[in-house]
Amino acid sequence: MNTVKSQHCVGDIRKIKPLLKKAELLVRVNPWNGESVEEINRVIAAGADIIMLPMWKSAEEVKNFLDAVGGRCKTTLLLETREAVECLDEVLEQGGMNEIHIGLNDLHLSYGLTFMIELLSNGVVERLCRKMEEKGVPYGFGGIARLGSGDLPAERIIMEHYRLHSTRAILSRSFCNTEYVRDIKEINELFDKNMCQLREYEKLVEKCSKEELLKNKYEIQTAVEKIVKAKKEKKNGYR
């Protein structure tokens, strides 16, 4: 798979923290394990503002994580396993987290799906969002590519964020891919340009009616069906 796992360490937190003026520093720790308490303590001591727990599979893991943090910083749960979906009601009943982010890539693999946006078109993300909204827990999902890019254009995904009342998203690698752009000045300019375009598009989406957002949902379903069909045909050697 075309994925990247950054080899960061606790020392990187100390380097980045002093450079931040407005942004909060979010640190994703390892999935819950026997060394998690020690890792969380070190991450907090280094200056993390928010800690993200990935790949959790039970309400007990979430409780252990929240107990380990002990209110010393904000917490976000990365919901990216089928087991997490199945125990979400219990997790929400326990409460204590600051926010939840739905990770579409690993979650679609957990369900054995072909394309991660199937989780939007088949209603899974919507059901999860409604549950979190009902409990008053801030939430978001997936990653956003730069406008005009992605298997499914980023514009359509952004409209779904608004329809589902999502308040946060992760920028995908394609938003500003440092594999292809190495010069730091060019990276900054590209990021600023893409960010400005995104904000301008958001202003347009804010004015969309419920009918327009619902129409986009159905168009996503149609587009996803075609994308999935094409991916399956390619996998099976058809053209």
Give a label for each model feature.
Residues 1-239:
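Expand to "…catalyze enediolate/carbanion chemistry for C-C bond making/breaking, isomerization
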